[in-house]
Amino acid sequence: MVVEYRKLQPEVILTHSYEDPYNPDHPYANMLTLQTRVYAQAAGYPAEGKQLGAPPVFIFEPHQPEQCEFKPQVLLDITPVYEIKEKAMESMEAQEHLWNYYRDLAKRRGTQAVRNSGKKGIKYAEAYQRVYPQVASEFS
């Protein structure tokens, strides 16, 4: 996977939460994602490709956030692409039982995004948790 990271040079990385009592493979995916990023950044790691920079890593919101120690830190406006997200979600028939949950969640996160940003055009949003601190030259 280190070779793939170095080949792709991702600008952003998304992964599962650190904990998930219902999906034990999700924390393993998280661990593998984070370890691979570290190795792909390491100058001395023996793998092909250009050393990876420092793409930010975000944990996407699981459907049981309270049980996964998820803490929303970033609200992403998905209003312009919500219909595409909805079609993609509906293509996963095995998770039909979650469709309404995620529709409602996108609306709730949209309301929170409006409240936290003052941008009234936001109807739908997603929540993410940062893995590493944000580096900035000024507050925004």
Go through each PLM region and give its residues.
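Metal-dependent de-N-acetylase/amidase catalytic core
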Residues: 1-140
